[in-house]
């Protein structure tokens, strides 16, 4: 993979991060201002991730048949059209459908670029390359919440800016030469996507726990935290600063953690960062002032902001090359399940319990993922065992 090729993939994922980082807080603020309930706000945020889940079972076969580039082109076009749709279609449930379409398009883009990077990276450089990939997404995601103040000028303005930037980045896709994922000589015509999903889950299930936890954390913070912060008396402008603090912390440590994972192992690094993140959110729950919360978000971002990319790297270490497309899809599926559960559970928690503390809820989630990694023992694979398990 050439540097220019890698740069285009990194650019695409950074713009995707920007649109996602903008959507969650902007729509949450618009709905809270319009008097929508926390439960509706949380449920609405699941639209993007429901789109991911709906599309996931049908992604692997087109990728193997068409290659990486066509899926990126189609995914990017769906995202761009949907972003501009927010400008013209003013309805809570139409916006939910637009979020769902963005989920489908974003997943096509992420799945293709992510599988392209993992399949082209050596084991020695995998952590570094995926950390750069994650860093680019984090940079975009960190920039997204800065669109929140534009809502004061016009509710449509954040969507216009995001749509135009996404269109510009999408045009670079046409400089890429198409390629196809690796296949195995042991595969037969009877092997299908669902069988490969089963094999990937059998040998790499423990690596999907961090991606689930990160999905829960990301949407709980970006979907439920703005509502929780407003109820604490924290201003919208302060929320626009606190939220990017997590992503900025993630950006700072994304690359060093990738290097450390190449040296000391993905599992060991994941155990340390998950425990650190849980402690940070516990402290934020005990001392809920804007300055303490901002500091805890920053430090937690330095730790758990790399959980998703380290989970992908760990999955790539555990699975054979021909199962990487299925493994990458399962990373996206588990991330989406966590992302759906995050805002729904967070919204329900805040609406049901009068003195609910969102940060304790997040602490419990991260601690549960840490415990799963401690107790989980991945199953080693061999070509003979892999195919006998599917027969």
UniProtKB/Swiss-Prot annotation:
Q: Which Pfam family, just one, is annotated for this protein?
A: MFS_1
InterPro entries per the UniProt record, alphabetical = MFS (IPR011701), MFS_dom (IPR020846), MFS_trans_sf (IPR036259), MFS_YcaD-like (IPR047200)
Cross-referenced PROSITE patterns, in alphabetical order? MFS
Q: How is it placed in the membrane, per its record?
A: Multi-pass membrane protein
Write down the CDD domains for this protein, in alphabetical order.
MFS_YcaD_like
Instruction: State any single GO MF term.
Output: transmembrane transporter activity
Provide the alphabetized UniProt keywords: Cell membrane, Membrane, Transmembrane, Transmembrane helix, Transport
- One Gene Ontology cellular component annotation held by this UniProt entry: plasma membrane
Location in the cell: Cell membrane
Instruction: Name the source's superkingdom.
Output: Bacteria
Q: Where are the transmembrane segments?
A: 7-27, 39-59, 66-88, 92-111, 131-151, 156-176, 197-217, 239-259, 269-289, 292-312, 329-349, 356-376
Please give the PANTHER family that the UniProt record associates with this protein: TRANSPORTER MFS SUPERFAMILY (PTHR23521:SF2)
The family note in this entry says: Belongs to the major facilitator superfamily.
Protein's recorded name: Uncharacterized MFS-type transporter YfkF
Source organism of the structure = Bacillus subtilis (strain 168)
Q: Gene name?
A: yfkF
């Amino acid at each position: 993979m050439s540097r220019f090729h890698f740069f285009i993939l990194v650019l695409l994922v950074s713009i995707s991060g920007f649109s996602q980082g903008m959507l969650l807080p902007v729509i949450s603020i618009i709905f809270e201002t319009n008097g929508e309930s926390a439960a509706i706000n949380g449920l609405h945020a699941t639209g993007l991730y429901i789109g991911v889940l709906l599309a996931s079972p049908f992604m692997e076969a087109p990728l193997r048949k068409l290659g990486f580039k066509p899926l990126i082109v189609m995914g990017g076009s769906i995202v761009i059209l949907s972003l501009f749709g927010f400008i013209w279609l003013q309805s809570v449930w139409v916006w939910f459908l637009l979020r769902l379409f963005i989920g489908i398009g974003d997943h096509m883009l992420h799945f293709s670029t992510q599988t392209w990077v993992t399949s082209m990276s050596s084991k020695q450089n995998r952590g570094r390359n995926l950390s750069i990939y994650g860093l680019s997404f984090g940079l975009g995601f960190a920039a997204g919440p800065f669109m929140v103040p534009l809502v004061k000028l016009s509710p449509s303005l954040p969507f216009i800016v995001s749509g135009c930037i996404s269109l510009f980045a999408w045009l670079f896709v046409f400089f890429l030469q198409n390629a196809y994922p690796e296949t195995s000589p042991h595969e037969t015509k009877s092997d299908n996507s669902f069988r490969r999903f089963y094999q990937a889950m059998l040998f790499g299930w423990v690596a999907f726990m961090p991606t689930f936890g990160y999905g829960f954390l990301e949407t709980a913070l970006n979907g439920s935290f703005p509502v929780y912060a407003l109820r604490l008396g924290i201003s919208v402008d302060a929320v626009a600063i606190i939220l990017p603090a997590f992503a900025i912390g993630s950006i700072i440590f994304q690359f060093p953690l990738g290097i450390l994972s190449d040296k000391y192992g993905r599992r060991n690094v994941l155990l340390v960062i998950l425990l650190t993140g849980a402690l940070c959110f516990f402290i934020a729950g005990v001392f809920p002032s804007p300055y303490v919360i901002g500091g805890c978000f920053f430090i937690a971002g330095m730790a758990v902001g790399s959980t998703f990319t380290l989970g992908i790297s760990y999955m790539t270490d555990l699975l054979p090359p021909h199962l990487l497309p299925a493994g990458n899809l399962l990373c996206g599926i588990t991330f989406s399940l966590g992302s759906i559960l995050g805002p729904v559970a967070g919204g329900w928690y805040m609406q049901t319990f009068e003195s609910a503390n969102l940060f304790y809820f997040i602490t419990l989630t991260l601690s549960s993922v840490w415990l799963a990694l401690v107790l989980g023992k991945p199953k080693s694979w061999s070509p003979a065992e892999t195919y006998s398990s599917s027969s």
